[in-house]
Amino acid sequence: MRNNRLYTLLALLLMAGRVTMQAQIRIDKQQCFGGYGDDIAYSIVEEEDFFLVAGLMEPSSIGTGHIQCDGNHQRTWVAKISKDNYEFMEGWCFDIMSLFVKIFKDENADGEYFLVGQWDCYGARNLTTIKIDSDGNELWRVCFGNEYGHIYEGGRLYTSDGGIINSGDYTDAGGDVGHIFGGYDGWLIKHDRNGNLEWELTLGSQALYESVLNVQQASDGGYYVCMQNESYGEGNIRCPEILSNATLVKLSQAGEIEWHECYGCANTAPERDENSAFIDVVELNDGYLFGGQANCNSGDLEGSGWHYGTLHNSPNGPYTSDIWLWKVDNNRNIIWSKCYGGSDNDFLLKTFQTEDGGFIVFGNTHSRNGDVASASHINLDEWNEGEGWIFRIDANGNLLWERCLGSAGGAGSTSITDVIKHNDREYTVLGNLICPPSGSSGDVNCTNCAQLSNPEFPHHLKDYWLFHITDTVDYSTISVPEMPVQQEASAEIYPNPTNNTVCVVLPNDAEATEMELINMNGQVVANKTFSGKSSWLEMADLPKGMYMLKIRNAEVCLTRKVLRE
């Protein structure tokens, strides 16, 4: 089990020799698709000559785009797009409304696919699977749930035995839902390839919520359930403290709980809505790489390099989240824990291991600073709606390069929703965007935007964006210092609170230690570099309030709160 005492792996600060750079990502081909309303794509599967993309169409787009749907309500659609030149081939509509719908290929039946999401049955919104053929004909559908329905959708998975796992957050038992512990609990079902229910499972406690965010296949035939949860009282998910945790649950193939682990913040600032969430698992030979997001620098994130920020830059607003990656050993003890992002919200989508032991990470960002240096080429304003973000790290979590992708200028509104890996260098990426008026802006160069055929139509509705990228970075030219030996991150900081100076005493002498004092607006108000074991910072002229003190050298990387009285 994971050690209760927190240890963090203390990375070297890569100063002038830091090897981050705007990535040499080449977009080989791309195209946009949609109508005059929002057409949101969520998932993609690959066949030999084409892709199938699944998404959701708003009523305003019905009858105006590539896919012609009937009715005046949201519709789920599937688009068939050629692989060679990204031409729209055909598409089909289905009378279900499902955010985050997933499409999976049935590996046991050529030309058949599963659409997995939600649909109104039992008089409420519940978990649904539709089986379709290669012509878009519905073969069958099944629905699981109860008359109360679910509140939020969860993770979906095509399993190694050809079945489907679907999940959502439920508040009431009944129907297919065997038990609810309290609040919002995560409920999962597994059915076979013919739609027959094999098992159902509730994950939760008496806390307000336990949400299933993702479900992944384990190499032993079982499953990983990625969650965000509070935890207390009766239930089968218990975490050490009552706070928002990133929790991973390991299930057997039969849906039985084998173990669960909780990670996250120490809840040192509950008024700032400190929280963490589990998103992704990569199995390694010597452990795991876990992925999620978090908005703190305490608990399991102490020394992780979280980038301070508040929502909309409000002085008293909730903290913003970074992408959080942490490597653990086979006993799930943390080896290193690192954050990536800037002072706004950053979100993880998917992580792939590369042949050299490193990782390529796909996500989305609203940040324009910190690790997100490449945002400058898109030139977004502070109220931007986000861009896609890709970055590469080595096996020790050192950032090698990063790249934002999207249209340029103003509010932006680009997101990555699914990725197909072809090899370490090539990926097909699915996303959504507001197509630029000319079809070309920033990284976007589309000839198929719906607005191009109707210049008078407002340019604020979303199309979906399909593009193929190649990583052209020469990794033989990149080197980073070896990681230091793991030790506990500690430093004595006093007096705290203080009304004039704050002293720092390190555990060991160091040649160059950097200190930065940051106010609650994210501004560096004092800094100093010193050699030796101790030094101090002057705070007498600073306004009263809370500050963050960052201390970094070759052995120590930590952040502490300092109160100026």
Q: Which residues fall in each region the model found?
A:
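Bacterial Sec-dependent N-terminal signal peptides
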Residues: 1-27, 480, 503, 523, ...
